């Protein structure tokens, strides 16, 4: 029964999240054009940079959410409500402390904003409105939404969080776009963002109370219980180091780009990362609902089932990510040129580095899921190396500019996330030969090497290899001439080479029948 329930919830996550993110992608690209035209590239760069700066403050979250989710897998599986209430109370207590600290630190940090944005054309009232608006939205996660976000995710109901969030996001972005088009008001843009963040919190917590009316989070109980649960703080300390590593890869990059360029360059960079992030979210929404499923499967302890699950998830995610990454490398700039204009196109080498980092960041997802499922957080030197790499990123930025800034994370990702972490999982988690990972990587990579070379030849034969496309019609023709052969050839080869692809295909057929 647990197996059937886990599979059912996984497919439900996939279906619902896929629909919401497809709609989100369409709305995001439509509204992004309006925001750039009406509010300007500099303002959009300001919001992106402020978000990155707040990432520094949010490091204080320490990885508590990920840690608590880990300690909820087993009690949710066993329906141990008392343990669930105790664990979520501990989270409430920790989040009360962390949220208060971040709020105070944010107020102090805001005093230095004139030094950070001294070269901008915005008034200080606009800069402070953007900063405090985004700070307020982040506070909702610490004081209001933490129970719903954590339990829904741990109980494989992440589709509810994503669904309600996307619904309010749709409404917010459409209203922001309408107001931007008619008023060009920075103030109204931020007011709408804050208002809909509040609406999302109200809806999410209403649904949470309906699904889990028995959950009671007590700050006092959490404070007392934490003294008897030292394993939680130990795990939090380990996760925190890993949170720093993620911060280097995500929040720090826009700030570093701003440090070596301008808010406008941040916008050009973020246009590409927006496209990549939307696709990344789409992939996660479709395939990321397996997070809690993996945790529950590992809790059952069947080693053969665990490895079979890893192999299947690795293969299907690799296929999807590799296909989309190669499409992005080949078509990204054409899309930007048609969507926003050629003035927003970055040099090809920068686009390639952005897309390679996109691939590496997503292709590691299966390994990360299983490491989290096993609770393996002892390899603290990995995120420490990521932090040290920040110095290399800054140094490379001084020497080679944006190329250096984007190249260093690629090298770090390959070394740490695609060599060391799989070894760590296979050795300390699944306890099987690391050679099986190299074999799995090879049989998944080979079909795409062959398929990509064949697709490039086909595209060139059709005359789509010269210059950027300038119309949607030409872009669609170029996209189809490349992506269709790539998909069909890769699928044909993967079906013959990859057992994981065949396993997933059989599962889908059985589900449909």
Where are these regions (language model features)?
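Interfacial/gating helices of multi-pass transporter permease domains
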Residues: 35-58, 87, 186-191, 227-235, ...
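Helix-terminus/linker motif at the lipid-water interface of multi-pass membrane proteins
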Residues: 26-44, 114-119, 180-183, 247-278, ...
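Short runs within selected transmembrane alpha-helices of multi-pass transporters and secretion channels
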Residues: 20, 24-28, 50-58, 62-69, ...
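Membrane-proximal transmembrane or re-entrant/amphipathic helices at the cytosolic face
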Residues: 2, 430-435, 455-513
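Interfacial segments at transmembrane-helix termini and the short loops linking adjacent helices
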Residues: 113-134, 328-359, 365, 430, ...
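Interhelical loop/hinge segments that connect adjacent transmembrane helices in multipass membrane
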Residues: 1-10, 187-190, 204-251, 293-308, ...
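N-terminal membrane topogenesis motif
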Residues: 1-28, 82-90, 125-127, 204, ...
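Helix-loop junctions and terminal segments of transmembrane helices
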Residues: 33, 62-78, 148-149, 153, ...
């Amino acid at each position: 029964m647990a197996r059937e329930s886990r599979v059912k919830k996984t497919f439900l996550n996939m279906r619902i999240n896929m629909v919401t993110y497809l709609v989100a992608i369409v709305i995001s690209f439509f509204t992004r054009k309006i925001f750039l035209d009406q509010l300007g590239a500099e303002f959009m760069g300001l919001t992106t940079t402020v978000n990155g700066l707040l990432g520094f403050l949010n490091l204080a979250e320490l990885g508590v959410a990920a840690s608590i989710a880990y300690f909820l897998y087993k009690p949710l599986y066993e329906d141990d409500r008392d343990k669930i209430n105790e664990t979520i109370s501990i989270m409430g207590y920790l989040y009360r402390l962390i949220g208060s600290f971040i709020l105070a630190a944010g107020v102090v940090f805001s005093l230095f904003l004139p030094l950070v944005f001294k070269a901008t054309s915005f008034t200080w009232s606009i800069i402070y409105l953007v900063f405090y608006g985004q700070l307020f939205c982040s506070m909702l996660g610490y004081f209001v939404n933490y129970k719903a976000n954590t339990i829904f995710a741990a109980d494989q109901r992440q589709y509810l969080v994503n669904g309600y969030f996307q619904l309010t996001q749709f409404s917010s972005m459409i209203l922001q776009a309408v107001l931007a088009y008619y008023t060009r008001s920075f103030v109204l843009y931020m007011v709408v963002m804050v208002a809909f963040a509040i609406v999302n919190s109200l809806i999410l917590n209403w649904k949470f109370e309906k699904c889990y009316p028995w959950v009671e989070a007590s700050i006092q109980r959490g404070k007392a219980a934490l003294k008897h649960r030292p394993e939680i703080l130990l795990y939090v300390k380990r996760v925190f180091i890993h949170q720093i590593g993620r911060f280097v890869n995500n929040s720090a990059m826009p700030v570093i780009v701003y440090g070596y360029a301008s808010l406008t360059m941040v916008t050009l960079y973020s246009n590409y990362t927006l496209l990549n992030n939307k696709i990344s979210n789409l992939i996660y929404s479709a395939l990321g609902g397996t997070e809690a499923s993996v945790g529950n499967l590992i809790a059952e302890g069947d080693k053969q089932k665990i490895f079979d699950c890893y192999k299947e998830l690795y293969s299907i995610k690799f296929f999807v990510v590799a296909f989309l990454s190669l499409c992005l490398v080949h078509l990204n700039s054409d899309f930007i040129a048609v969507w926003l204009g050629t003035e927003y196109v970055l040099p090809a080498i920068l686009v390639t580095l952005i897309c390679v980092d996109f691939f590496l960041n997503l292709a590691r997802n299966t390994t990360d899921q299983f490491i989290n499922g096993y609770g393996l957080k002892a390899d603290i030197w990995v995120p420490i190396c990521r932090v040290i790499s920040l110095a290399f990123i800054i140094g490379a930025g001084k020497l080679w500019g944006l190329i250096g800034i984007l190249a260093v994370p690629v090298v770090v990702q390959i070394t740490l996330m695609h060599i060391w972490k799989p070894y760590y999982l296979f050795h300390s988690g699944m306890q099987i030969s690391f050679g099986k990972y190299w074999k799995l990587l090879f049989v998944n990579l080979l079909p795409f090497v062959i398929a990509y070379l064949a697709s490039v030849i086909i595209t060139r034969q059709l005359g789509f290899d010269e210059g950027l496309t300038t119309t949607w019609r030409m872009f669609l023709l170029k996209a189809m001439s490349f992506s269709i052969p790539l998909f069909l050839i890769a699928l044909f080869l993967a079906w013959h080479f990859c057992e994981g692809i065949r396993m997933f295909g059989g599962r889908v057929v059985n589900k449909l029948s």
